[in-house]
Amino acid sequence: MTGAATAAENSATQLEFYRKALNFNVIGRYDPKIKQLLFHTPHASLYKWDFKKDEWNKLEYQGVLAIYLRDVSQNTNLLPVSPQEVDIFDSQNGSNNIQVNNGSDNSNRNSSGNGNSYKSNDSLTYNCGKTLSGKDIYNYGLIILNRINPDNFSMGIVPNSVVNKRKVFNAEEDTLNPLECMGVEVKDELVIIKNLKHEVYGIWIHTVSDRQNIYELIKYLLENEPKDSFA
């Protein structure tokens, strides 16, 4: 390797380190419990599936997407458990078969006649993200640092084993604030996530290789016991 190539590689490494540090610090303003940045990608756009209309709706969230480890060791609450919902963590703020034929990043996703479909037994539709409240069990977070307006998008990520244990060992809280196991898959150019409130989001990621990487990371986080740190 030539001196010029080595210098270029070192410069790229330093730039990546700077970006990670910057993203960590920015996320920390919104979520002080951030512990470790696990992955980030420079540009993502967000869609939400409308169960009633059977179509994707493009949301006003575009920017850096990051997935990170959170410190939940203090066993604190996000909000008091209440039968009434109040927005806090998810900010926009079964077996599911998802088909997305048009993978381009444009507003045509919200046309029900273009072959896009999400089939589910759930007939509910929500106008905004549901609340995550009660005991803070959200081991991981996903955030889009929005370039369009001041509102960021965030989503709590919890291993499915934690959700299932909550149903058994904390049934009262689960009754007041029920959570469902999350799911993730990648279809065409969307990473599709079913969140804890059974809402479905599609994330279009500009960097092609990052789509599979983000899918595999979220899948790993959901299918394994929570970790305190990653090497």
From Swiss-Prot:
Database matches in SUPFAM superfamilies: PH domain-like
Gene3D superfamilies the UniProt entry points to: Pleckstrin-homology domain (PH domain)/Phosphotyrosine-binding domain (PTB)
Keyword Transit peptide belongs to the record: no
Pfam family, one: DCP1
Keyword RNA-binding tagged: yes
A GO molecular-function descriptor: mRNA binding
Key words of the record: Cytoplasm, mRNA processing, Nonsense-mediated mRNA decay, Phosphoprotein, RNA-binding
Subcellular localization: Cytoplasm, P-body
GO process terms (BP): deadenylation-dependent decapping of nuclear-transcribed mRNA; deadenylation-independent decapping of nuclear-transcribed mRNA; mRNA processing; nuclear-transcribed mRNA catabolic process, nonsense-mediated decay
Chief location category: cytoplasm
Start and end residues of each stretch annotated as Disordered: 92-120
Phenotype for residue 47 to F: In DCP1-35; partial loss of mRNA decapping activity
Post-translation changes: Phosphorylated.
GO cellular component: cytoplasm; cytoplasmic side of membrane; nucleus; P-body; RNA decapping complex
Bias (Low complexity) ranges: 101-120
Subunit-level organization: Component of the decapping complex composed of DCP1 and DCP2. Interacts with mRNAs, DHH1, LSM1, LSM2, LSM3, LSM4, LSM5, LSM6, LSM7, and the cap-binding proteins PAB1 and TIF4632/eIF-4G.
Note: Present with 2880 molecules/cell in log phase SD medium.
Recorded family membership: Belongs to the DCP1 family.
Job of this protein: Component of the decapping complex necessary for the degradation of mRNAs, both in normal mRNA turnover and in nonsense-mediated mRNA decay. Removes the 7-methyl guanine cap structure from mRNA molecules, yielding a 5'-phosphorylated mRNA fragment and 7m-GDP. Decapping is the major pathway of mRNA degradation in yeast. It occurs through deadenylation, decapping and subsequent 5' to 3' exonucleolytic decay of the transcript body. DCP1 is activated by the DEAD-box helicase DHH1 and destabilizes the eIF-4F cap-binding complex from the mRNA.
Name of the molecule in the record: mRNA-decapping enzyme subunit 1
Species of the source: Saccharomyces cerevisiae (strain ATCC 204508 / S288c) (Baker's yeast)
Gene of this entry: DCP1
